[in-house]
Amino acid sequence: MKKDIHPAYRPVVFYDASAEFKILTRSTVETKETIQWEDGNEYPLVRIDVSSKSHPFYTGKQNIVDTAGRVDRFRRKYGKKN
């Protein structure tokens, strides 16, 4: 492999603020923020919007979208007039 062309693969903390969930894993993502982890070491921090702790599919708190009501409303508004 060529030298100095591959991104650094290092430990990184991903933080989901909506669920107050942090996970230490490895990644090549670039970030300027850092955080002190439970082991006392400082790691790069990546803030994410959704994780397995906050996504409706994984939490079981899915919202059912009322598409039937939307379709009926669309047909009333734009449908053919008899």
Swiss-Prot record:
SUPFAM superfamilies: L28p-like (SSF143800). GO terms for biological process: translation. Keywords: Ribonucleoprotein, Ribosomal protein. One of its GO terms (cellular component) is ribonucleoprotein complex. It comes from the Bacteria. Part of the 50S ribosomal subunit. PANTHER family: 50S RIBOSOMAL PROTEIN L31, CHLOROPLASTIC, LARGE RIBOSOMAL SUBUNIT PROTEIN BL31C. This is Large ribosomal subunit protein bL31B. It comes from Dichelobacter nodosus (strain VCS1703A). The gene is rpmE2.
